[in-house]
């Protein structure tokens, strides 16, 4: 469980460096990613705290602790500290997926959806990722895993196709997905909707 490497700390009022740079509210516990091999039960030394540990902690919480009551605050911290974070993470996730480093790619997509749950571009990218992962596992003969990832892909394709405003590419990619599933009627329906939107846009 990735959350096991996280500790929540409350910064002292006189903590200035990161507080000034990252707009820290010292009344709200801050998630911190502990370095590998650190004893979680040992008292945390505030002098070892870095911006990277805070950002990594926040991303982990965004990815795996969807019920945390401070998510909006954590999102605001990371967005102010790293204005281009979504672009950077998206590029990293796509690169990891392309290199078939699937577990890391999935973690990054989880963090991206936690960072901005309303971003349907991220939802569509997640669908494409699971689609690719299913194809890779199927080619390797891991059919049960492939079927599970197909289910994940369909879940996110459906979300992307319900997006407002409409994302035509969601229907285009879902069409190919359903063709691979041999669900030809659903694939045809997706392509027809895609064409209707594209022609209308032109």
Label for each model-derived stretch:
Residues 43-47, 72-90, 202:
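TPR-adjacent "capping" and linker segments in tetratricopeptide-repeat scaffold/adaptor proteins
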Residues 83, 117, 164-165, 199:
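Short coil turns that delineate tetratricopeptide repeat
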Residues 111-112, 159-160, 193-194:
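Canonical positions in the second alpha-helix
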Residues 121-122, 170:
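TPR alpha-solenoid repeat register
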């Amino acid at each position: 469980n990735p959350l096991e490497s996280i500790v929540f700390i409350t910064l002292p009022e006189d903590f200035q460096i990161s507080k000034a740079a990252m707009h820290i509210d010292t009344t709200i516990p801050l998630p911190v990613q502990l370095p590998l091999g650190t004893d979680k039960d040992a008292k945390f030394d505030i002098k070892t705290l870095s911006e990277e540990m805070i950002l990594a902690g926040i991303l982990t919480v965004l990815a795996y602790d969807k019920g945390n009551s401070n998510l909006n605050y954590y999102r605001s911290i990371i967005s102010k500290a790293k204005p281009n974070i979504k672009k950077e993470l998206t590029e990293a996730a796509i690169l990891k997926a392309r290199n078939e480093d699937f577990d890391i790619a999935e973690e990054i997509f989880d963090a991206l959806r936690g960072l901005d749950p309303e971003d349907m571009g991220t939802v569509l990218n997640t669908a494409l990722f699971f689609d690719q992962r299913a194809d890779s596992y199927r080619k390797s003969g891991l059919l049960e895993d492939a079927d599970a990832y197909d289910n994940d892909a369909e879940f996110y394709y459906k979300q992307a196709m319900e997006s407002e405003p409409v994302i035509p590419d969601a229907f285009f990619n879902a069409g190919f997905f359903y063709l691979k599933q041999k669900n030809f009627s659903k694939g045809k329906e997706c392509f027809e909707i895609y064409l209707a939107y594209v022609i209308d846009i032109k």
